[in-house]
Amino acid sequence: YANEYQAIRPALKKDIRAVHNLIQRGVRNEELVKRTRAELERRIQDYFVFEVDRNPVACVALHPYPDDNKAELASMYVDPRYENQGIGSRLIAYAEAQARARGYETLFCLSTQAVNYFIHKGGFQLGTPDDLPPLRREAYERSGRRSQVLIKPLTEPVKSLPGTSHSDSAS
């Protein structure tokens, strides 16, 4: 997704400070789990940024669990000055498209505060810790955060939006 002023793209090393600052804001609001700069540096290839006028104003991570054919949507944060503009929904759709392109069967996320957002805007459904890959479940249980597990199967075809039917009518 891109236009003159807005774009979603993979995060680069030069984005580490901006991504870290976005995540820190989410941590202060108790919306996100703390990430160190070192962790970001190690996993920057998992992150995507949403830019406005070439400035990152939102981020999301897609952490792969290839042995389980699952991917985790994590660390999603939108600068409050850019909220209610559909950026979060676009980040979810972008991460989902990346997960589908890589052949993952399930996208999952953990949330303590945005459960309704992920269900209503992201198309996720409530899951259980049993839906998590074993490595992720261990970390979930150690964290003690008691986040809600949300899952989204990626094996079904993408549903078309209302008013955009793809029927094979002869014209």
Give the location of each predicted region.
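Short amphipathic alpha-helix that is part of the acyltransferase structural core
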Residues: 1-34, 51, 72, 146-171
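Small/polar loops that bind or transfer phosphate-bearing groups
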Residues: 11, 109-110
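A conserved beta-strand-loop-helix scaffold within acyl/acetyltransferase catalytic domains
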Residues: 32-53, 57-70, 74-79
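Conserved acetyl-CoA-binding loop-helix of GNAT-fold acetyltransferases
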Residues: 78, 84-97, 101, 109
